From Swiss-Prot:
Residues 286-483 form the RdRp catalytic domain. Phosphorylated by host PRKCA. This is RNA-directed RNA polymerase catalytic subunit. Its main location: host cell. It is found in: Host nucleus; Host cytoplasm. Coiled coil: none annotated.
């Protein structure tokens, strides 16, 4: 029988059907090839929005820079970056007036963080631009390389492990006339293989020292590497995102810490909270506006969209904000916070890999690296690319483009939210001094504006005033993409509000299914996702039960572990059938061993091993949870693990799930082919780093681990700890005198070696 799809919706309120219109099933689009074109688009657009600013030349790097601040007053309808400093400062002053002491308190909180943060904070994060190798690396490796180079150039403040001391090194490095760096390179040789007697190419990895003069070093330190943003749904065009180097990261972290502390105290800020907490915060603002718009007032809400938020923001504006927020604070604190925006005013965008050319006729492919774009003949390019390159040429230096105005995506989310909220704050009656007033919500570039007024003219006037006020600080509300409704129906950060938040279930669809980590983790993550959606996203019991059955089916197909008594033939069925027949208590077998599924919506919170433990045969228990089993690489067993789940919107979320280590918690080995590439040196560095950290953790189990106070290196800390522990063990008779003196001897040897080095 054919089902008419409209019948499905007869009983469903319109707002609940919204989620069926979202492009969230199936794989998201990924980008291929280089991001060079997208990056050039960003650079050119940013300059176009600020074109009436003043041009200057950076005295250190020779880069041409455009400064749109306090430029002409912005025009209607056209997005522009001409923020006016005095307007921004005034908005900050009014924000402080409405929230007495907010900046003062946030500064105090941040100061404490600045004093305590360790440099290892910078190892968090994924890909980072590594200026020593001029490409992206995992954050930990990039940091290790930077510290290594600093050390070999006589900068040693960071030995203490405090982030602030590392930043002192960064500042000093910028004053040096030259820096010596170590880079990796590959040599290829043709040699005869002894076994096969064939010629093979042998690659060897070398490290070579290279001197970089002040100008080149500064360009590298100020460079943001660019990539294409992947997996973005609902867009036709891809766009570029930036990853900054280690010199910038620490300074940005402190600025964002300050801004986060301010956002936490602002009721209109959608950051840094998320999920249900965010919904509650938003609902409060809406409730306030609706309660106050008594029968005499109209209340309307704009679901807002800003045109090119990042490209019209300006680091110079952020500098003004920070200067205001930190007034009356100690000089060192003001200095350290003002460095990030200053670095961003002088930033360079790396254009990525360059362009790929292929000649169909001659079957040739060649890469034109970004460095060549400044000099290459443009006749090889098509019309649109030619225009891009012509526009960007005056800005190019060594394959990077000078990009003074604008912020790259995701750098100062918190601080830009503070700016947005400061405009929402001006909507109070005491500031508008008329019959209309407004309030709203801001989360990075997304906003919702609620306007109240006695009549429609008042609403219109309020919206106009908000629009123009935003223009003065470089925020461009898009008239085309924002829409207005009676208060009670709007969308904000993909939350749909209809007299309360409607669950937008389609957002969670991508996270259902089998993750592909291993049998144990996948089972646990799968049921946790269903459980979480019952709690947070209106997933009803019947649908949840169905989701569970689909998940189990999916899981069995993925791991080819159909029930032992099934007819389905796979390459595992022979073994699983044998196990099924040998097992007395078949209910005790895990699903991944061909057992039955005992999950239902009431017991999703229990890990499968625990759920079935009492039902298992004894020898099965022994095999399943045996620490000596050679097939299991047992990490220390944490009771809770973190999985990365992909919601449809926003970054990958980290989700906790219960982890019980069994023979099914295997960890796949690293691909061998990496060992023959130029990445090898990096891999070795990374393993070295890992080993050091593991060793350190052996000396300082987490229970006794306090933040190291005072200045000592990891080695010194471990040696002194070893001495203390040895003495205690010797005095309590746990170790013999010979062992004690041997430990003491080893400690002295280590210290001696350190002194010689």
């Amino acid at each position: 029988m054919d089902v008419n799809p409209t019948l499905l919706f007869l009983k469903v309120p319109a707002q609940n059907a919204i989620s069926t219109t979202f492009p969230y099933t199936g794989d998201p689009p990924y980008s291929h090839g280089t991001g060079t074109g997208y990056t050039m688009d960003t650079v050119n657009r940013t300059h176009q929005y600020s074109e009436k600013g003043k041009w200057t030349t950076n005295t250190e790097t020779g880069a041409p820079q455009l400064n749109p601040i306090d430029g002409p007053l912005p025009e209607d309808n056209e997005p522009s970056g001409y923020a006016q400093t005095d307007c921004v400062l005034e908005a900050m002053a009014f924000l402080e007036e409405s929230h007495p002491g907010i900046f003062e308190n946030s500064c105090l909180e941040t100061m404490e963080v600045v004093q305590q943060t360790r440099v290892d904070r910078l190892t968090q994060g994924r890909q980072t631009y590594d200026w020593t190798l001029n490409r992206n690396q995992p954050a930990a490796t990039a940091l290790a390389n930077t510290i290594e180079v600093f050390r070999s150039n006589g900068l040693t403040a960071n030995e203490s492990g405090r982030l602030i001391d590392f930043l002192k090194d960064v500042m000093e490095s910028m004053d040096k006339e030259e820096m010596e760096i170590t880079t990796h390179f590959q040599r290829k040789r043709r040699v005869r293989d002894n076994m096969t007697k064939k010629m093979v190419t042998q690659r060897t990895i070398g490290k070579k020292k290279q001197r970089v003069n002040k100008r080149s070093y500064l360009i590298r330190a100020l460079t943001l590497n660019t990539m294409t943003k992947d997996a973005e749904r609902g867009k036709l065009k891809r766009r570029a995102i930036a990853t900054p180097g280690m010199q910038i990261r620490g300074f940005v972290y402190f600025v964002e810490t300050l801004a986060r502390s301010i956002c936490e105290k602002l009721e209109q800020s959608g950051l840094p909270v998320g999920g249900n907490e965010k919904k509650a915060k938003l609902a409060n603002v809406v409730r306030k506006m609706m309660t106050n718009s008594q029968d005499t007032e109209l209340s309307f809400t704009i679901t807002g969209d800003n045109t090119k938020w990042n490209e019209n923001q300006n680091p110079r504006m952020f500098l003004a904000m920070i200067t205001y927020i930190t007034k009356n604070q100690p000089e060192w604190f003001r200095n350290i916070l003002s460095i990030a925006p200053i670095m961003f005013s002088n930033k360079m965008a790396r254009l990525g890999k360059g362009y790929m050319f292929e000649s169909k006729r001659m079957k040739l492919r060649t890469q034109i690296p970004a460095e060549m774009l400044a000099s290459i003949d443009l006749k090889y390019f098509n019309e649109s690319t030619r225009k891009k390159i012509e526009k960007i040429r005056p800005l190019l230096i060594d394959g990077t483009a000078s990009l003074s105005p604008g912020m790259m995506m995701g750098m100062f989310n918190m601080l830009s939210t503070v700016l947005g909220v400061s405009i929402l704050n001006l909507g109070q009656k005491k500031y508008t001094k008329t019959t209309y007033w407004w309030d709203g919500l801001q989360s990075s570039d997304d906003f919702a504006l609620i306007v109240n007024a006695p009549n429609h003219e008042g609403i219109q006037a309020g919206v106009d005033r908000f629009y123009r006020t935003c223009k003065l600080v470089g925020i461009n509300m898009s008239k085309k993409k924002s829409y207005i409704n009676r208060t009670g129906t709007f969308e904000f950060t993909s939350f749909f509000y209809r007299y309360g938040f409607v669950a937008n279930f389609s957002m969670e669809l991508p996270s259902f299914g089998v993750s592909g980590i291993n049998e144990s983790a996948d089972m646990s993550i799968g049921v946790t996702v269903i459980k979480n959606n019952m709690i947070n996203n209106d997933l009803g019991p019947a649908t949840a039960q169905m989701a569970l059955q689909l998940f189990i089916k999916d899981y069995r197909y993925t791991y080819r572990c159909h029930r032992g008594d099934t007819q389905i033939q796979t390459r595992r069925s022979f073994e699983l059938k044998k196990l099924w027949e040998q097992t007395r208590s078949k209910a005790g077998l895990l699903v991944s061993d061909g057992g039955p599924n005992l999950y239902n919506i009431r017991n999703l919170h229990i890990p499968e091993v625990c759920l079935k433990w009492e039902l298992m045969d004894e020898d099965y228990q022994g095999r399943l949870c045996n620490p000596l089993n050679p097939f299991v690489s047992h990490k220390e067993i944490e009771s809770v693990n973190n999985a990365v789940v992909m919601p449809a919107h926003g970054p990958a979320k980290s989700m906790e799930y219960d982890a019980v280590a069994t023979t099914h918690s295997w960890i796949p080995k690293r691909n061998r082919s990496i060992l023959n590439t130029s990445q090898r040196g990096i891999l070795e560095d990374e393993q070295m780093y890992q080993k050091c950290c593991n060793l350190f953790e052996k000396f300082f189990p987490s229970s006794s681990y306090r933040r190291p106070v005072g200045i000592s290196s990891m080695v010194e800390a471990m040696v002194s700890r070893a001495r203390i522990d040895a003495r205690i063990d010797f005095e309590s008779g746990r170790i013999k005198k010979e062992e004690f003196s041997e430990i003491m001897k080893i400690c002295s040897t280590i210290e001696e070696l350190r002194r010689q080095k």
